[in-house]
Amino acid sequence: MSVQDNNEGRPELGPVEWGKVVEYHLWGYVAKLNDSGDIGLVDAVSSHDLLERRIPDCWPALGDHIKVRRLGVAPGGQLRLTGRQSDIDLN
């Protein structure tokens, strides 16, 4: 599934999907999507709506099941995800 730009040039978010946190990096965490098995990155900026909650101490634990949405694919081919509640709640 690809994510396409809307009329304003911003990416349209994919549907809400469940994933499992499988890995941490300094810049974010990796989730494996339950249905597709795709692996994607939730970078720190996309991890939470509140700036003070975007730190590793506030990220979900390894093995936690989380809701995410696809943001698109980075130039290097990496799937980008968002875990921000404001993005999850969008229709």
Predicted segments — roles?
Residues 1-91:
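Single-stranded RNA-binding regions, centering on S1/OB-family and related RNA-binding modules
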